[in-house]
Amino acid sequence: MDFTNREVYLKSLKDIKEHKINVQPSLIYQLLIKVNEFENFTSLIVNFDSKIKDIDKFNQLFNRLKNGEPFEYVVNEASFVSLMLYVDNNVLIPRVETEGLMNIVNKIIDDNKLNDSTIIDMCTGSGCIGLYMKYTHRNSRVIVSDISKEALKIAKKNSENLNLEIEVLESDKLDVFLKNHIKCDIFLSNPPYVERKEDIFDEVKKYEPMNAVFVENNDIFYEECFKHYKEVMNDKFLMAFEINYDQKERLTKLIGKYFTNDDTKFLFLKDIFGKDRYLIILGGYDVNYFEMWSWKSNWYYKKRWFSLFSYWNSFWFRLYC
């Protein structure tokens, strides 16, 4: 039997309402766009009363969605700022918080003219951070690393799909850069930082890779980076991390332990939900445009210079942390 897109939409909408299934109606539209291979929402509306291209495929995807599988895994796509990435359950779905980190990093890069830099993205997952850096700074050398072979396959796939050239290394330790004599100007990372499993939503536990979310001790990774920063960073450098909301005090002490130069400065920034989420460390730069505290000289100055992304069309981290 043939069904129009309108009929499929109304039937699906009735299904989720009658059975009280937690699926946003807008996702039904997006599934229809995907199945019909339309370019955008306008194309769907124009063809709303036309026959759906593949009702069996729609039903298969819709059933996965009703079972609680994240939409990005169902359609194998996730948007990240201005990029569209392939994702599956071997990698974490890119989050709006990481988009916020990109906004901050690009502001610092532009203000300090770091466009021709060597950039490391550690714990890359889908490659979202490294690929966005390459997309916005085409003359930079970008190296991404991850301990997961499957994640690296996806990062490579996204690199090819986007026609963005990056280098890929398998490791979650700094030694891979030391062995390859790689030093960088910019070091970025969104490592696993959740310690308590009760802090995570069921759909994350069920579908997303736990090694990309959980860690036994969420300070160890950062301490390793701080301890060996002189071996992997050039004299002038930027380091930027996503962190857990409760790490600020502990990381401040670690920074004071390992960064002993007067010209090394750092600050913590909040995400759009008001939680401490970003750590920025700058070495060798005369920074004078945003709130920062130097642990040694104990000076600071203020200027609010960035605004984080609105999140009405973005995917929340699904963590209570």
What are these regions (language model features)?
Residues 1-58:
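A short N-terminal interaction module
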Residues 4, 8, 54, 147, ...:
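Soluble or luminal CAZymes and related metallo-dependent hydrolases
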Residues 33-107:
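Conserved AdoMet
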Residues 86, 217-282:
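Conserved Class I SAM-dependent methyltransferase catalytic core
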Residues 94, 125, 272-275:
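Short glycine/threonine-rich catalytic loop with a Thr-x-Gly-x-Asp
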Residues 100-197, 201, 224:
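Conserved SAM/SAH cofactor-binding pocket of Class I
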Residues 191-221:
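Mobile active-site "lid"/loop adjacent to the S-adenosyl-L-methionine
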Residues 287, 291-299, 303-308, 312-319:
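Cationic, amphipathic, low-complexity alpha-helical segments enriched
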